[in-house]
C-alpha cells in the first residue's frame, strides 16, 4: 500500500522553507536589488575573501572551476568508491551563468561515484563515467537576499543492462544573509525524469549550507538537506549532516574539505543491514580555481 506520509512531510518542508524565507527577509539590513543589469558588488574585498557575504553567482566574465574529489568513508568501505567530479561555470553577464557539471543536484554533498569514478568495478564503481550536466542560472534578486532561477539537464549512465537516464531539474538557488558573517545557502530543485521513468523516478533535492565567516579567508559550513523520490518521499527521504571548511589561499584559489554522515537523520530503511546511521560517511575535497 502506498504510504500516506509523503504529503504531510512535503507540507512540513514547504512550511519550514517559507518560515526561513520570512525570517531572512525580516533580518535583512540592506535593500534587495532586482537582477537584469549591472549588479552592485557586495564586498570590495579581494576575490575569494569574505565568501559568506557573496551571492550564488559570479560577476560577468568570471570563470570558476570547482574540482571535487569524493571519497566513500563508510565502515569497512573506505575509498570504495572514489570519484573525481569537476564543475565548470562561466558568468556571461552579472545575471546569467552557465555551467558544465559532474556533481549532482546536492552539490558539494554529492555522494562518491558521481562524475569520473577512479576505483574500478570491484571497488564500488558502477561505470567509469557516470553523469554529466548542463547548468543555467539567472539572477533575480541581490543584496541581503540573493535569489536565482536554477535549472539543469543531467545525462545519467547506468551499468548494463539498465538504460541511461535523462533528468531535468528546476528550482531556485539563493542565500539569506542574516549578518555579514552568517548566511544560509539553499538550492531546492525538483528532478523530472525525461526517459525510462520506470527506472528513474522524479526526485526532490534540497541542499542546505549554514555558513559562518570565521575570518576573512576561512568559512565554516554546517551541511544538511533532504533528498528522496517524490512519489514516495516519506519512505525514501535521506537527510545528510556534515561539516565543511573552505580556506581562501589566493584571489584565484580556494581549498575545502567536508565530512558528512550521508543519512544521519533520514529514513531508517536506507541503511543497509548491519550498519548504523553513523557508519555511512563520505569525504569531499574541494579545489576552486577562478580566472
What are these model-derived regions, one by one?
Residues 29-195, 202-291:
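Transmembrane beta-barrel domains of Gram-negative outer membranes and organellar outer membranes
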Amino acid at each position: 500500500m502506498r504510504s500516506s506520509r509523503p504529503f504531510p512531510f512535503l507540507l512540513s518542508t514547504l512550511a519550514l522553507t517559507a518560515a526561513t524565507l520570512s525570517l531572512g527577509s525580516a533580518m535583512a539590513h540592506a535593500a534587495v536589488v532586482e537582477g537584469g543589469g549591472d549588479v552592485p558588488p557586495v564586498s570590495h574585498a579581494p576575490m575569494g575573501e569574505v565568501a559568506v557575504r557573496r551571492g550564488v553567482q559570479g560577476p560577468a566574465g568570471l570563470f570558476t572551476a570547482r574540482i571535487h574529489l569524493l571519497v566513500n568513508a563508510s565502515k569497512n568501505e573506505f575509498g570504495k568508491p572514489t570519484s573525481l567530479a569537476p564543475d565548470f561555470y562561466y558568468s556571461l553577464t552579472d545575471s546569467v551563468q552557465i555551467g558544465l557539471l559532474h556533481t549532482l543536484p546536492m552539490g558539494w554533498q554529492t555522494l562518491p561515484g558521481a562524475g569520473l569514478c577512479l576505483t574500478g568495478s570491484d571497488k564500488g564503481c558502477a561505470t567509469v563515467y557516470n553523469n554529466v550536466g548542463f547548468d543555467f542560472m539567472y539572477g533575480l534578486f541581490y543584496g541581503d537576499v540573493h535569489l536565482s532561477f536554477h535549472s539543469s539537464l543531467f545525462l545519467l549512465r547506468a551499468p548494463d543492462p539498465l538504460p541511461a537516464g535523462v533528468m531535468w531539474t528546476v528550482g531556485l538557488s539563493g542565500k539569506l544573509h542574516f549578518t555579514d558573517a552568517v548566511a544560509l545557502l539553499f538550492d531546492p530543485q525538483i528532478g523530472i525524469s525525461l526517459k525510462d521513468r520506470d527506472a528513474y523516478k522524479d526526485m526532490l533535492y534540497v541542499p542546505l549550507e549554514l555558513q559562518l565567516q570565521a575570518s576573512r579567508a576561512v568559512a565554516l559550513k554546517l551541511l544538511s538537506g533532504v533528498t528522496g523520490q517524490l512519489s514516495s518521499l516519506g519512505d525514501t527521504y535521506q537527510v545528510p549532516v556534515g561539516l565543511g571548511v573552505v580556506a581562501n589561499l589566493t584571489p584565484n584559489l580556494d581549498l575545502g574539505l567536508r565530512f558528512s554522515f550521508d543519512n544521519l537523520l533520514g529514513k531508517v530503511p536506507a541503511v543497509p543491514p548491519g550498519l548504523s546511521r553513523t557508519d555511512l560517511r563520505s569525504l569531499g575535497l574541494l579545489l576552486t580555481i577562478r580566472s
